[in-house]
UniProtKB/Swiss-Prot annotation:
Molecular-function annotations in GO: glutamyl-tRNA reductase activity; NADP binding
UniProt subunit comment: Homodimer.
InterPro entries in alphabetical order: 4pyrrol_synth_GluRdtase, 4pyrrol_synth_GluRdtase_dimer, 4pyrrol_synth_GluRdtase_N, GluRdtase_CS, GluRdtase_dimer_dom_sf, GluRdtase_N_sf, NAD(P)-bd_dom_sf, Shikm_DH/Glu-tRNA_Rdtase
Additional free-text comment from the UniProt record: During catalysis, the active site Cys acts as a nucleophile attacking the alpha-carbonyl group of tRNA-bound glutamate with the formation of a thioester intermediate between enzyme and glutamate, and the concomitant release of tRNA(Glu). The thioester intermediate is finally reduced by direct hydride transfer from NADPH, to form the product GSA.
Record-stated family: Belongs to the glutamyl-tRNA reductase family.
Free-text domain note: Possesses an unusual extended V-shaped dimeric structure with each monomer consisting of three distinct domains arranged along a curved 'spinal' alpha-helix. The N-terminal catalytic domain specifically recognizes the glutamate moiety of the substrate. The second domain is the NADPH-binding domain, and the third C-terminal domain is responsible for dimerization.
Reactions listed under catalytic activity: (S)-4-amino-5-oxopentanoate + tRNA(Glu) + NADP(+) = L-glutamyl-tRNA(Glu) + NADPH + H(+)
This protein's record includes keyword Oxidoreductase: yes
Name recorded for this polypeptide: Glutamyl-tRNA reductase
Active site as annotated: 50 (nucleophile)
Pathway: Porphyrin-containing compound metabolism; protoporphyrin-IX biosynthesis; 5-aminolevulinate from L-glutamyl-tRNA(Glu): step 1/2
Organism of provenance: Escherichia coli O1:K1 / APEC
EC code: 1.2.1.70
Binding site residues for NADP(+): 189-194
Length: 418
């Protein structure tokens, strides 16, 4: 049995190839059935995300294994093998285990340390168990990878610092406000960045969110997901005073929030502080707003400096994480080898017990027929000895004939001979 990991990712293949090799969720069961129908495959898990498509397999070793699996992947997706071969990576046994642990821990992600990949790996594993998983070694490898990812999160700072603009904006808000559960957040725009911001805010228990957008339809879809209120851009002037935090990201060519607008809001708030995070380019908030007392304005450049600092921290944490992964992968492979030895020991013991039972039964039958007890016991001992040493004796003789001193010494050591 051999453990394999093969696939492509954002580092080895452009999106034009990754999208052709991806497995859609509605066809995943069919793909797993087809994969497990291959004679050398004992168990398989398919991980398919926007940044990677990977097969994790338990297989029987054979000479054409790599070619057979590449051929299956290309046939399934109607690809030319040459298009895929140069982008494909291939990991075996310890390297396969280490790769999965790195993936689950976010060490191989486009955004170093991102947490979403662990959920994606868990889902891929769960999907494989719906009547598809056959190999216990593969199941153990995934379960171990989940615990390693948790250990990496717990023992290092790999996920502690924001490395996306959306996450950095929310981290900044959490640093300024002791609790986000009591604040009101005004979100200007309804694009992808604001969508990510709303998810982070919801995770931090923000109760009141207001979304201002040029088109109500898109904003309403997002608002329905997070329980927010939708207003028009023209309503910002009137509603700004309610907001403790304003996060803006639109494609407007001109500022949407001006100095005068914020001055009026601060006056209505009796100068309670406001945090304004402008992550738009061009800027949505006039730079002069930052000069107002109690208005704390941060631009996308300010966030980028936070992200750069945090990315350096994550890279330092990644060194610790890699050490954990290397240690855990080595220990897992040692455990796997021990399991293989346990099966051999069990088979050897079972064989010896069969010989014992067979010869004991014959001896008892001879005693019942009135045979001489001493003669029967001596015969039992002689036959038992010969049967048990027959296979080791043949191996010793063959090693001697082959001039294989190393094997001969291993056999002597195994038999406890000085």
């Amino acid at each position: 049995m051999t453990l394999l990991a093969l696939g492509i990712n954002h580092k080895t293949a452009p999106v034009s190839l990754r999208e052709r090799v991806s497995f859609s969720p509605d066809k995943l069961d069919q793909a797993l059935d087809s994969l497990l129908a291959q004679p050398m495959v004992q168990g398989g898990v398919v991980l398919s995300t926007c940044n990677r498509t990977e097969l994790y397999l338990s297989v029987e070793e054979r000479d054409d294994l790599q070619e057979a699996l590449i051929r299956w992947l290309c046939d399934y997706h109607n690809l030319n093998e040459d298009d895929l071969r140069n982008s494909l990576y291939w990991h075996q046994d310890n390297d396969a285990v280490s790769h999965l642990m790195r993936v689950a821990s976010g060490l191989d992600s486009l955004v170093l340390g991102e947490p979403q990949i662990l959920g994606q790996v868990k889902k891929a594993f769960a999907d494989s168990q719906k009547g598809h998983m056959k190999a216990s070694e593969l199941e153990r490898m995934f379960q171990k990878s989940f615990s390693v990812a948790k250990r990496v999160r717990t023992e290092t700072d790999i996920g502690a610092s924001a490395v996306s603009v959306a996450f950095a904006a929310c981290t900044l808000a959490r640093q300024i406000f002791e609790s986000l559960s009591t604040v009101t957040v005004l979100l200007v725009g309804a694009g992808e960045t604001i969508e990510l911001v709303t998810r982070h805010l919801r995770e931090h228990k923000v109760q009141k969110m207001i979304i201002a957008n040029r088109t109500r339809e898109r904003a309403q879809i997002l608002a329905d997901e997070v329980g927010a209120e939708v207003i028009a851009l023209s309503d910002i002037d009137e509603r700004l005073r309610e907001a403790d935090i304003i996060i803006s990201s639109t494609a407007s060519p001109l500022p949407i929030i001006g100095k005068g607008m914020v001055e009026r809001a601060l006056k209505s708030r009796r100068n309670q502080p406001m945090l304004l995070v402008d992550i738009a380019v061009p800027r949505d908030v006039e730079p002069e707003v930052g000069k107002l007392a109690n208005a704390y304005l941060y631009s996308v450049d300010d966030l980028q400096s936070i992200i750069s600092h945090n990315l350096a921290q994550r890279k330092a944490a990644a060194v610790e994480a890699e050490t954990i992964v290397a240690q855990e992968a080595s220990e897992f492979m040692a455990w796997l080898r021990a399991q293989s030895a346990s099966e051999t020991i069990r088979d050897y013991r079972s064989q010896a017990e069969q010989v014992r039972d067979e010869l004991t039964a014959k001896a008892l039958a001879a005693l019942e027929q009135g045979g001489d007890a001493q003669t029967i016991m001596q015969d039992l001992a002689w036959k038992l000895t010969n049967r048990l040493i027959h296979a080791p004796t043949k191996s010793l003789q063959q090693a001697a004939r082959d001039g294989d001193n190393e094997r001969l010494n291993i056999l002597r050591d195994s038999l406890g001979l000085e």
